[in-house]
């Protein structure tokens, strides 16, 4: 089996980008170690701090964020970074070539129940001139690399550099990421969906109708039965989609009118959308292709619908209908 370093060489990924990817991978090994130790190391539980999103930070949110910051500062190729746990962008190296956006511990609410968590990252080219938040506001099409590390029964790295999606598994004895799937591919059709059903009453009419039709199964307009899955960590739900197909969605809702969207564009939706597209799937907000969005702020949130291409198209078809006669959700 190829190691991650050997794979990057075989794909002719340039030296500086390869170095950055290896730094991210090496840091994820240390994060995996911290996650595995859990309560034994006293790293579980919440702090009294909130991040810029107003979410209570877990101890491991802060620990993993600092681990990635320190590693990227030492790497030498990174101009600046943006993190879910940082209010503002962080300048790293004046002559760095890349910008890195990341969610250091996606699904951290799962950590206290020993369920799936992961790290999501996106690599963008660093523009010339002074580093500001605007430097990061590039569409997802500009991503040079994207991936996630899933900390589960095995620690796995899913990676794209624009040449498909490869999956690596961390060998527990050698501590090397080894290539275990050279070409992840999402089947175009599916009978599996992932959504937080507890928010159903807050969704827009198109999503309410779409999910209602899925639940009708063979007796409904879709004429086939669907299974529902929900891990409560985007990294886990998207990994399942990449592994066996499906559709994952976190749609617009009015549960909190000030926050109609849940997932962050720059370090959640964009990297996952690139992975999904590179594996043959589609990713949309319901009204716009995610990778075509022009960001307006670092912590911008968006609705997300991604996965098997034909099923995403089916979902999007509901968003083009007239729901003027439907009861209001207000």
Swiss-Prot record:
Keyword NAD: no
Biological source species: Shewanella sp. (strain ANA-3)
Keywords: Carbohydrate metabolism, Cytoplasm, Hydrolase, Magnesium, Metal-binding
Broad class of where this protein is predominantly found: cytoplasm
Protein name as it appears in the record: Fructose-1,6-bisphosphatase class 1
Cofactor(s) the record lists: Mg(2+)
Segments passing through the bilayer: none
Residue numbers binding Mg(2+) 1: 84, 103, 105
Enzyme Commission code(s) on record: 3.1.3.11
Source taxon at top rank: Bacteria
Matching InterPro entries: FBPase_C_dom, FBPase_class-1, FBPase_N, FBPtase
Pfam families in the record: FBPase, FBPase_C
Family: Belongs to the FBPase class 1 family.
Any one GO molecular function term: magnesium ion binding
Subcellular location: Cytoplasm
Pathway: Carbohydrate biosynthesis; gluconeogenesis
Name of the encoding gene: fbp
Subunit structure: Homotetramer.
Catalytic activities: beta-D-fructose 1,6-bisphosphate + H2O = beta-D-fructose 6-phosphate + phosphate
């Amino acid at each position: 089996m190829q190691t991650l370093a050997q794979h990057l060489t075989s794909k002719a990924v340039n030296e500086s980008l390869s170095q950055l990817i290896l730094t991210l991978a090496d840091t994820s090994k240390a994060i995996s170690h911290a996650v595995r130790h859990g309560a034994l190391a006293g790293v579980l539980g919440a702090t009294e701090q909130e991040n810029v999103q107003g979410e209570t930070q877990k101890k491991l949110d802060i620990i993993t964020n600092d681990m990635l910051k320190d590693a990227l500062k030492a790497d030498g190729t990174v101009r600046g970074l943006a993190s879910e746990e940082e209010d503002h962008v962080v300048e790293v190296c004046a002559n760095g070539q890349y910008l890195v956006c990341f969610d250091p511990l996606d699904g951290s609410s799962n950590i206290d129940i020993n369920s799936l968590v992961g790290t999501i990252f996106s690599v963008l080219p660093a523009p010339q001139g002074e580093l500001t938040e605007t430097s990061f506001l590039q569409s997802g099409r500009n991503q040079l690399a994207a991936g996630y590390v899933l900390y589960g029964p095995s620690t796995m790295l899913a990676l794209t550099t624009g040449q498909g999606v490869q999956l690596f598994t961390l060998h527990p004895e050698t501590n090397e990421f080894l290539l275990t799937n050279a070409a992840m591919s999402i089947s175009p059709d599916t009978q599996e969906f992932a959504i937080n059903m507890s928010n159903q009453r807050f969704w827009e009419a198109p999503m309410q109708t779409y999910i209602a039709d899925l639940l009708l199964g063979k007796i409904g307009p879709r004429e086939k039965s669907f299974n529902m899955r929900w891990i409560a960590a985007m990294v886990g739900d998207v990994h399942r989609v990449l592994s066996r197909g499906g559709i994952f969605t976190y749609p617009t809702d009015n549960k909190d009118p000030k926050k109609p969207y849940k997932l962050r564009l720059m370090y959640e939706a964009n990297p996952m959308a690139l992975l999904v597209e590179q594996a043959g799937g589609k990713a949309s907000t319901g009204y716009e292709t995610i990778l075509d969005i022009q960001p307006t702020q670092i912590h911008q949130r968006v609705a997300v619908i991604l996965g098997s291409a034909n099923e995403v198209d089916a979902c999007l078809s509901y968003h083009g209908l007239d729901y003027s006669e439907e009861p209001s959700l207000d």
